[in-house]
């Protein structure tokens, strides 16, 4: 795949340099691939195939680093550049002949919020070449009031984490102080904001509540948030109105941020949900992105073409609309995505208590079987398409890896009753993989120039307490799968296009001007991999399995993977959005 938009990009560095070049005699013009103000070089990556993240063709050459920044990317076919580079002494040289040198990969949908506190190396992602985790799908790690902190603590203590922070800025500060192996960015969660102001109310906000919500978005933007993220199929987020979301997105846009959303529907009402996102972008002035773009359920697969048409039309009108995806046909969520929202109101305790009532249970079962529900039901394609990934309760671990149909048969109950039993016994911690997408649609999405990649997973290690829970393979394999299966093995897209879609594209969508490219002055976030060997190895049966083929990964110029092995280094930084005002004094009440 080589669309006009992908093949004809003019490098931004060259564009910026044109006035200078045109003003100088040809003999005095400076090479655009070099930071001429830098007089030192700490590392030379020598002889690799450089794919710079722009979508332009790669070249054999050298990438020179000075500490945490890139000094130059030199094409060996350019005698002048080679001569300049050879004249610059580098303290260290690493021979990377036969390997691809690319910008570090950007995970546009990361749930490493808690796993990075347990193990700051983020190895499942780093082993694939990921150098930036972008969090905040609906829920973010602040701002919190005490009830929210208590709920998070109840959940997180199961994973060995006791949250002490209140704001997103506090969370950033804690990560920075503790040390992290990858860079971290985050949107502020629209659900988190809503619960802070309104609790779990099922109505839209009044004028004063909306003003408070906007002020919290403003504070989060000043703390470094990338914008506002929503997840509209889950309670209580599903009660957010379009007006409410547009107002929050507008506040983010005033600070240079964007809006990103798990759509209100990915199945029966998919087209309406896409139009809502486009409307929010148009009304707010915010660029907008769709989380894990999909047409879920066999009956809805044909809708993807209409979605693509709608987004293409919106983009032609000047709106900045994009999407991300993961390269698997199975989604993953909880059993809350298989039950009507009303039964979940008020949180886990009330949800469980309601399900224990025989009359409520009967009503829930009937609605779970309704082929045309007015809510998003990921079980519509059948219990044989829903596989148990993980539970908290030890007594239930014997079911991990089984489908809901198999669990129901083993327990002698219906699949709907089995799901209800799991929620009651595990108190909603149950994780399910739902096979709801088509391979043909997956390939079609990969070829769209405005689609990037997000794992929609945490970043565990294949060791310790992480082994108690199975994982969706996307946690260990999303990026390697794109480069191995869909680029090398099946030629669905070209290497330069794929690298652009996991580096330069998401960086541009985030408004980053110094990451996502191999260019002078950019941060030295780099992935060095063997294009002939890179591949995902994680499966549903053996999920804790690292990807293969990545030899070296640099985060801010420091190696976190060297010769295919983790170094233990923690050089990650907080990547803050354009509204950041440095050290922000918290204005959040301590209630």
Predicted regions and their residues:
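Metal-associated gating/positioning segment near the N- to mid-region
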Residues: 93-163
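Histidine-rich, glycine-flanked metal-binding segment
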Residues: 35-44, 50-104, 119
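Active-site neighborhoods of metal-dependent hydrolases
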Residues: 172-175, 180-207, 211-234, 249, ...
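C-terminal cap of metal-dependent C-N hydrolases
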Residues: 357, 444-451, 456, 527-573
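Divalent metal-coordination and catalytic microenvironments
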Residues: 48, 68, 98, 109, ...
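Acidic, glycine-enriched loop/beta-strand segments at the rims
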Residues: 50-62, 430-436, 441-442, 490-499, ...
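Divalent metal-binding pocket/active-site signature
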Residues: 219-276
């Amino acid at each position: 795949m080589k669309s006009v938009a992908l093949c004809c990009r003019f490098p931004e560095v060259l564009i910026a340099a044109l006035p200078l070049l045109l003003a100088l005699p040809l003999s005095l013009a400076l090479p655009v691939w070099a930071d001429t103000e830098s007089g030192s070089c700490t590392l030379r990556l020598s002889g690799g195939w450089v794919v710079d993240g722009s979508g332009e063709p790669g070249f054999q050459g050298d990438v020179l680093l000075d500490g945490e920044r890139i000094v130059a990317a030199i094409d060996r076919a350019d005698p002048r550049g080679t001569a300049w580079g050879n004249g610059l002494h580098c303290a260290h040289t690493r021979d990377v002949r036969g390997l691809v040198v690319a910008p570090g990969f950007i995970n546009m949908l990361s749930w490493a919020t808690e796993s990075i506190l347990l193990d700051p190396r983020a190895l499942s992602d780093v082993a694939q070449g990921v150098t930036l985790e972008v969090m905040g799908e609906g829920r973010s790690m602040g701002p919190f009031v005490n009830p929210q902190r208590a709920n998070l603590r109840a959940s997180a203590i199961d994973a060995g984490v006791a949250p002490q922070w209140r704001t997103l800025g506090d969370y950033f500060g804690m990560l920075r102080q503790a040390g992290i192996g990858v860079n971290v960015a985050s949107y502020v969660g629209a659900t988190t904001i809503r619960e802070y102001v309104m609790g779990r109310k099922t109505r839209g906000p009044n004028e004063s509540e909306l003003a408070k919500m906007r002020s919290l978005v403003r504070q989060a933007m000043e703390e470094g948030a990338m914008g506002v993220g929503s997840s509209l199929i889950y309670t209580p987020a599903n009660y957010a109105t379009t007006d409410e979301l547009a107002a929050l997105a507008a506040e983010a846009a005033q600070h240079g941020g964007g809006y990103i959303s798990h759509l209100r529907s990915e199945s029966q009402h998919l087209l309406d949900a896409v139009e809502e996102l486009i409307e929010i972008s148009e009304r707010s002035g915010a660029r907008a992105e769709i989380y894990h773009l999909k047409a879920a359920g066999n009956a809805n697969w044909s809708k993807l073409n209409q979605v693509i048409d709608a987004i293409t039309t919106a983009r032609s009108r000047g709106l900045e609309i994009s999407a991300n995806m993961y390269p698997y046909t199975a989604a993953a969520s909880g059993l809350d995505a298989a039950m009507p929202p009303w039964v979940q109101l008020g949180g886990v305790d009330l949800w469980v208590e309601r399900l224990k009532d025989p009359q409520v249970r009967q009503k829930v079962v009937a609605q779970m079987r309704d082929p045309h529900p007015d809510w998003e039901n990921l079980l519509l394609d059948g219990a044989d398409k829903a596989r148990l990934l993980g539970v908290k309760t030890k007594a239930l671990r014997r079911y991990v890896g089984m489908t809901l149909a198999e669990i129901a048969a083993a327990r002698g109950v219906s699949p709907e009753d089995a799901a209800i039993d799991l929620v009651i016994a595990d108190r909603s911690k149950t994780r399910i993989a739902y096979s709801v997408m088509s391979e043909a649609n997956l390939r079609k999405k990969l070829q769209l120039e405005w689609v990037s990649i997000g794992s929609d997973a945490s970043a565990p290690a294949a060791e310790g307490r992480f082994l108690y829970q199975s994982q969706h393979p996307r946690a260990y394999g999303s990026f390697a799968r794109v480069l191995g299966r869909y680029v090398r093995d099946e030629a669905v897209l070209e290497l330069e296009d794929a690298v652009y879609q996991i580096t330069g594209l998401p960086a541009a969508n985030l408004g980053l001007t110094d990451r996502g490219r191999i260019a002078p002055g950019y941060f030295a976030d780099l992935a060095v991999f063997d294009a002939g060997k890179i591949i995902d190895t994680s499966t549903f049966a053996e999920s804790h399995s690292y990807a293969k083929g990545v030899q070296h990964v640099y985060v801010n110029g420091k190696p976190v993977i060297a010769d295919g092995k983790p170094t233990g280094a923690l050089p990650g930084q907080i990547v803050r959005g354009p509204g950041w005002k440095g050290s922000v004094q918290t204005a959040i009440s301590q209630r």
